[in-house]
Amino acid sequence: MTATITITNPILSGMNPDPSWIWDDEFQRIVLVTSTFELVPGLPIYVSEDMTCWKHVSNVIDADLARRLLIPFVDDSGGVYAPTLRRIHGKYVIACTIARLDDRRAMEGGCTESELMRFHAAEGNFILEADSIEGPWRGPFWIEGAEGIDPDIFEDGDGNVYWTQTRPAVNPQWEGQTEVWTQRINPETWTFADDGLPAGSGKTVIWRGYGMESVWAEAPHLYRVGDYVYLMTAEGGTSFEHSEMAMRIYAPHGLLRAFEAYEREASELGECIPQVRDGERCYLGTAIRAFHADKKNPILTHRHLGLSEPLQCVGHADLLLHPKLGWWLVCLGVRETRGKRDGELLSYLGRESFVAPVSWEHNPADWKLDGNGASYTHEGDPGWPVTCAGLGRLADEITVTTEDDGIAIEPRVKSSLAGDVEPALVDVADGSTNDVVVRDERDVSYRRIAKLPTLMPIPMSGSLVIRQNSTHYAVFSMHGTDVRYEMVNGDDSQAGSVAALRADGARPAVLFDDNRLSVIVTGMHGLVDSATFVRQGQVLLSVDARFLSTEWAGGFVGCMAGFMA
């Protein structure tokens, strides 16, 4: 029997960064979560059987949990960073970080000293756990002694559980160097192991980047595949140099035994590896390393495609094995809009979630080392992950055909991923129940702008707010037959009004397209469809919208459309 499906990228449009996913064997579905920064509710849970259609089933963080996580007191682009979703000892577990907390604001908002002490002892790192993906979620369990961001939680085949994350290098060789460390953790108490064994008593540094002057090795994930434990990290920073690297360690009897074997081998070779700090280990020697890199790294990037490529910043990946569709990864990417200047790229939608098929390959020249130190050639060697084999980049459409005797995957790239001709219609006053707020500021409810161009009707009462952050936003409102507007670009602002000259029943709207915000009105009653509205409408006002881009405003988020009553 033959079945064909088509997966379209991005799978989650608009601001859905830092995706992490699992195959939920109990319910035969994929479960995926993304970062939400200062938005509440936060950590949305999406499910899908085959990646063609995603259903939003719940939010992990409600207003009450947001307060316990101190989200009301974070700065712009602070809050919930880079969740990792896993099943650990039968529980659904999310490891995550709260970043950019404003202590003064927290104290003024009623936080106790003990709350802040627990937060800082964990550097904002925490665990949430649940028996059902729909919740309720228990926590936060602040991870005392954690250090850095982007935590991963990994259960090995022997039952040992490892907490792994990235921190600034203690003794950096260059600016921007980070190091990935791991330590075993007790999943019942969520406290670090302290037994004197490798990765037990103190942190163990296992990676600092793939090459010379590598920066921002982060978003680590550990996976067991056959006799190996693989480490994947994003490197280069979440911008135009973003990439994904793969490393591995031979660990047929568990990661703990592999670490013990590394220590013995280092001792036999006379390898003297200086401690990073007292009580910590380092498995990055001059002669040998615990984890060996794929010589074909990076396994995923778009940085080699140049600035003519509209899909940039690709990385921060997470692997998944689907029982029918095989290996896949999910990652973030940014769809850029071309500016007026040479080489100018501008992002308004934020970082979105993309998927790609993954195959496992060996070096066919078996007389060479396979990029993994010692030449293991046994049948238990899975090889290395290859993303979108034969394409070398993300696809915008992936056709998957399953037959009785196998599976065929065909990734395709269109001429451009930069946008659609038909404008999306976002009516912020339609009473949607899926809106979010920023921190605990409930005067405006928002939704993600998921596509450009987008047409947004101006409410007849209340205001339309287009937000990048608290210092870069635009407000439009009706006052009689006039449209009033305010544009805030950091310390600069611009305000005014234009006569709408509308027929009764026709609502002016704002078109967000081609780096501009345009107020459009027609003589028609009602909005009709967005394409007709734009085609037949009169432009009353058109302003440069680049101040709403991430490149101008800074930070890590995308634009949202909001309703202010």
PLM-predicted stretches and their roles:
Residues 1-565:
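Carbohydrate-active catalytic/glycan-binding domains of CAZyme proteins
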